Amino acid sequence: MRWLIFICTSLFLFTLPLAAEDKVKVIDGDTIHVGKLKYRFLGIDAPEMDQVCKKNQQDIMCGVIAKNALIEKINNSPVTCKIEEVDRYKRLVAECFVKEESLSRYLVRNGYAVAYRRYSIKFVEDEEYAKQNQLGLWSMTFDYPWDHRAKLRSK
């Protein structure tokens, strides 16, 4: 029952701008911390921090690039998050915004992340745009983040 109250309260509270004193810390290309809360972006999957992509036979740390793109996009601006659910890792799965622009949409549309169809189809059109324009990941050879994680688990 407490979880239900927490979730209902959170759905209301966290659609408001997060407190200015709650500094946003970017963990990777699809996860941020705000204060003590951890937000996993809804419907997208960004490369892992250790993930290497290839472009013109050169290794590119595409997870680091995704994280840096998110840091640059947020740029100390206020972040607003709309919580959709709590995942099995107790992360708040949310769509977060800067200046009313979806960070998930920005990351996928610019090729820093892919649509995570297993959980949502909301950003599939944005992925198609990035793919057609060979933006970000789509200008490289890469493993989908979930395939990269599976390879690591199988070792």
Q: Residues of each region from the PLM?
A:
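Small beta-barrel nucleic-acid-binding modules, primarily SNase/OB-fold domains
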Residues: 2-8, 14-155
